[in-house]
A protein has these predicted regions:
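Conserved ABC ATPase "signature" region
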Residues: 45, 59-77
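A short, surface-exposed alpha-helical micro-motif characterized by mixed small hydrophobic
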Residues: 147-149
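ABC ATPase nucleotide-binding domains
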Residues: 178-205
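Catalytic Walker B motif of ABC-type/P-loop ATPase nucleotide-binding domains
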Residues: 106-110
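Conserved catalytic motifs of ABC-family nucleotide-binding domains
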Residues: 102
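Conserved ABC ATPase signature
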Residues: 56, 81-85, 89
Length: 205
């Protein structure tokens, strides 16, 4: 997981030039939009482009597309035009497009943007499930609480540079959070042993 510092603290761009690159890396860009009045399922089908061997969709393509729609909970509006969907619905369709490509690695830039709290948790569990199936996931998040709960590895950016990287416990220390975010915070485990972050307030910097 890649965790930026304060807003505007630095980001990254991944460009895949090789036509077969989509088999290796699937990218979900922040603020990605579509102005085409195509259906959601047609947009998800675009994710199969790296696997296409001819015209039309193969049986394997259709299985992958259906699985991506189910995983993202977008089946119910798969036949609606993308331009008619809400921001949260479009965000889930765009993730479905990535999943349909069955990449080995997923780069998700702000995958929680425009999602309600419940769907944010669903998205994070979805990404964790991908890891459980042997995929690699790099996600850019600003919400520290989500990073604490779901990250295996954290890269903390500050002023466009790597400030610290490693496990959640090693990176999201009180001193690091104070230096980067200007907050008084500490990690702890709740009664069930789940890591949590307590933010007490701001610190003077």
């Amino acid at each position: 997981l890649l965790l930026p510092g304060r807003s505007g603290g630095g980001g990254g761009v991944v460009v895949v030039a090789d036509g077969a690159g989509g088999k290796v890396l699937g990218v979900r860009r922040q603020g990605a939009r579509t102005h085409w009045a195509i259906t959601a399922i047609a947009l998800v089908a675009v994710g199969r482009y790296p696997h296409r061997k001819g015209f039309g969709l193969s049986a394997e393509d259709r299985v992958a597309i259906d699985a991506a729609l189910v995983a993202t909970g977008t089946t119910s509006f798969a036949d609606r035009r993308v331009t008619e969907l809400s921001g949260g619905e479009r965000a889930r369709v765009l993730m479905a497009r990535v999943l349909a490509g069955e990449p080995q690695w997923i780069l998700a830039d702000e995958p929680l943007a425009n999602l309600d709290p419940g769907y944010q948790i669903d998205m994070l569990h979805l990404l964790r499930d991908q890891v459980g199936h042997g995929k690699g996931v790099v996600a850019v998040l600003h919400d520290l609480h989500h990073a604490v709960r779901f990250a295996d590895h954290v890269v903390l950016l500050h002023q466009g540079k790597v400030f610290a990287q490693g496990s959640v416990a090693d990176v999201l220390t009180s001193s690091n959070l104070s230096a980067v975010y200007g907050i008084d915070a500490k990690l702890f485990s709740d009664e069930e042993g789940t890591p949590q972050l307590l933010i007490k307030g701001k610190t003077a910097r």
